[in-house]
Amino acid sequence: MAQAGTTDLTPSIRWILAGLSLSMLLSSIGTSIANVSLPTLAQAFDASFQQVQWVVIAYLVTITTVIVSVGRLGDMTGRRRLLLVGVFLFTVASVLCGVAPTLWLLIAARAAQGLGAAIMMALTMAFVGETVPKSQVGSAMGLLGTMSAIGTALGPSLGGMLISEFSWR
């Protein structure tokens, strides 16, 4: 039963919120999943630790430099279209990360993945404001914040599991 002054979320809004939560989770996992793989990558590519650190740095620098302008770009081109582009870019870049034959291609793929993640993070938050009833925006933002924290915390464990079970690819 809904409390006075609140609105229940319709099933379609719940599905939208689930999709937005997944978008936030995936982009947040990307921030920390590669950290534990750096020693393995240094060995696989016969590279120094300073060189393989760029796998993490490329992702984070791209997110931090692009995320602010994504909101305005979404206003100009359409948020839904741009979010789908971000998800597509993130997915393709993730595949490229898995098959990269050189360290430099892996770094470039991580930068592209960071671009997709920046789009996903920024527009996920924007969609909450236009999709969820005003009385539920705080709860929805809390859910997205929780998904971001879970993704960031889950990244190293997931990365370690993937490295130990399947190698870095």
Show the residue positions of the predicted features:
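Transmembrane-helix bundle of Major Facilitator Superfamily
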Residues: A2-R169
